[in-house]
Amino acid sequence: MPFYCSPTALQRLYHPAGERAVAAAAEKFGTMFGVSSLGTVSIKELRKHKNPQVYQFYFHKDRGLNRAMLEEAKEAGVEVLMLTVDSITGGNRERDLRSGFSIPFSLTLGGIIQFAIKPLWGFNYLTHAKFCLPQLDDHVDMSDGALSIGRYLTEMLDPSMNWRDVEDMVKFWDGQFCLKGIMSVEDAKKAVDIGCSGIILSNHGGRQLDGSRSPFDQLAEIVDAVGDKIDIIMDSGVQRGTHVIKALSLGAKAVGGGRYYLFPLAAAGQRGVERALGLMKAEIIRGMRLMGCNSVNDLSKKNLKFRQR
């Protein structure tokens, strides 16, 4: 299936099974699954699944931390590294600021009220494995207080990251390496020059720079520029099988989604994710049949007609 589960953080916040449920559902559909640096299940455990996986990584100020985390990923058997380049500082997550969200959890008055209204939340929290961040536990000391995701992105990540840093990481990894968050032809060409094997056109679902251009609007020009030199994937805002078909028609090799499977995960765990992936697969197949296409190889720009602006 040309749709995959993009890496998302903190999946056990949505359901106790978290990444375990998503990985199992993706394996059932034979599609790719992304594991986040801020994941709540270890990459070592998730590697037992046979479907393709990528490890999404953030670039830290501490170069020793970067190297140590990459070494652990290699030892776990990770084959594809995905470096996120559009989140070198935290976005303005106003809801998180209002709620006081942090890791480990710190109860606020609002949180206590929510737990009282929904006692099953508290029961699940107390009866399931402790919430943690396995990819960071050995490297980040959170014993002195709560760490918000915004603080992690702003204080620990390196806003001075440059192309030389990325090139050094590509060489150190010495395997399949992709950049997530590419949004221009110039950057796509640079990714090719330094030896990346793939790029993901993404604006982080609009959660970082809310006024950024849609990745779909960038897709055609980037495919025209480097599509024959590097694998191009797209995510952000994908909700329908016809969205996937349009992106594939413009030259994307695959399309990812995050919130698309997170809400079903929250509602029904693995069954919910399987239901979402099943609906997506059915929509893609139905749309292609109605277009007279038997294979994704039949899709091309000829299938699309853009509005004149």
Which positions does each model-derived feature cover?
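Active-site entrance/lid segments in N-terminal catalytic domains of soluble metabolic enzymes
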Residues: M1-D193, G205-Q208
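Structured core elements
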Residues: Y4, M82, C178-L179, I200, ...
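Electropositive phosphate-/nucleotide-binding environments in soluble metabolic enzymes
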Residues: P16, R20, T40, R63, ...
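Alpha-helix C-terminal capping segments
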Residues: A24-F29, K48, D193-I194, V223-V226, ...
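Short acidic/polar active-site loop segments enriched in Thr and Asp
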Residues: M32, E79, S197, K253, ...
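Extended hydrophobic/aromatic segments used for targeting, binding, or gating
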Residues: K44, V192, S197-M234
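Short hydrophobic/aromatic-enriched beta-strand-loop microsegments
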Residues: P52-Y58, G198-N203, A254-G258
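Alpha/beta catalytic cores of nucleotide-metabolism and tRNA/nucleoside-modifying enzymes
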Residues: D217-D235, Q239-R309
